[in-house]
Swiss-Prot record:
Keyword Ribosomal protein recorded: yes
Keywords per UniProt: Repressor, Ribonucleoprotein, Ribosomal protein, RNA-binding, rRNA-binding, Translation regulation, tRNA-binding
Record Gene3D superfamilies: 3.30.190.20, 3.40.50.790
Gene: rplA
Family in the record: Belongs to the universal ribosomal protein uL1 family.
SUPFAM superfamilies reported for this sequence: Ribosomal protein L1 (SSF56808)
Functional summary from the UniProt entry: Binds directly to 23S rRNA. The L1 stalk is quite mobile in the ribosome, and is involved in E site tRNA release. Protein L1 is also a translational repressor protein, it controls the translation of the L11 operon by binding to its mRNA.
Alphabetized HAMAP family for the sequence: Ribosomal_uL1_B
Organism: Salmonella arizonae (strain ATCC BAA-731 / CDC346-86 / RSK2980)
The protein's assembly and partners: Part of the 50S ribosomal subunit.
GO biological process: regulation of translation; translation
The protein's name: Large ribosomal subunit protein uL1
Gene Ontology MF terms in the entry: rRNA binding; structural constituent of ribosome; tRNA binding
Length: 234
């Protein structure tokens, strides 16, 4: 049996894997146990009551967290004309059409989010094999294919998170950094849960949000008691 590291021993002693913690207690635990030499992200895993094998029950979308994610996001936009000027004014680092596609084909991918206006998808479509595996392919379901590219850029910069359930029906995303105030992490989590509820497939039966766990980049998951969250989120 592998020997537990000192860090993992401390986590096991502090975190009761069978308990659901009040959100404030859960955040305090994460802050106490975050001892990495960098500012860890706070990640969330939400177990949904869906059948992930059925396409009509899959959950996918995006929402802007009220306090952002703490990450600096570089945005590339495929568009032209007045939209190109609007995208630049909104803060996009890279804006173009065929010229931007050529950069990407050469492996120049210094960006975190790709946005496209509908008329640019003929160009973006050639990049599916490059952008797709990295989760960067623009998609109207998450607001990254849109005629209003300026708004999409602002959302990305403001701390928009994208979510999509995995094959087990679990959503994994981030809600901030461990050095955020506890109230900000709580409000970000509540905003995410509200967005997930709005995205509930009509075919999903029974309990929809079954379990919510939060963790830091290097830490263990802490289950959250949903009763301690705002009424709109639980």
């Amino acid at each position: 049996m592998a020997k537990l590291t000192k860090r993992m021993r401390v986590i096991r002693e502090k975190v009761d894997a069978t308990k659901q913690y009040d959100i404030n207690e859960a955040i305090s635990l994460l802050k106490e146990l975050a001892t990495a030499k960098f500012v860890e992200s706070v990640d969330v895993a939400v177990n949904l009551g869906i059948d992930a094998r059925k396409s009509d029950q899959n959950v996918r979308g995006a929402t802007v967290l009220p306090h952002g994610t703490g990450r600096s996001v570089r945005v590339a936009v495929f568009t032209q004309g007045a939209n190109a000027e609007a995208a630049k004014a909104a803060g996009a680092e890279l804006v173009g059409m065929e010229d931007l596609a050529e950069q990407i084909k050469k492996g120049e991918m210094n960006f975190d989010v790709v946005i496209a206006s509908p008329d640019a998808m003929r160009v973006v479509g050639q990049l599916g094999q490059v952008l797709g595996p990295r989760g960067l392919m623009p998609n109207p379901k998450v607001g990254t294919v849109t005629p209003n590219v300026a708004e999409a850029v602002k959302n990305a910069k403001a701390g928009q998170v994208r979510y999509r359930n995995d094959k087990n029906g679990i959503i994994h995303t981030t809600i901030g950094k461990v050095d955020f105030d506890a109230d900000k992490l709580k409000e970000n989590l509540e905003a995410l849960l509200v967005a997930l509820k709005k995205a509930k497939p009509s075919q999903a039966k029974g309990v929809y949000i079954k379990k919510v766990s939060i963790s830091t980049t290097m830490g263990a998951g802490v289950a959250v008691d949903q009763a301690g969250l705002s009424a709109s989120a639980n």
